[in-house]
Amino acid sequence: MEQAQAPRFPDVDLTDLQAAWADILGRARLVQSHKITREQLSVREHMSIVLKKLQGRRFAPFEALFDPAQGVPVLVVTLIALLELAKETLVEITQAEAYAPIYVRLAFTPAG
């Protein structure tokens, strides 16, 4: 009888992920304009964008997947897209040790 596989979580310290996210938001606020518009943002569309950014790359720095100039709403949707991709095991979020840089790669990319 087969046993149900336990969900696999990213091998990243949550505190470091939060710190990296806070750094990205801080940079976004430096280039923030005050034009307010209503914009529909698709998580699925941003999932595709993240996957395209990772194609052909062994690893990408976590910060490289975000463009602070696009504003906080796009950054938030991109983060949600990245976490959804990790949940669906399409990407891996890794960190060598505490306080080390965080990297993202396609889950099916050979490590070596």
Model feature map: region roles:
Residues 1-112:
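Long, charge-dense, low-complexity tracts
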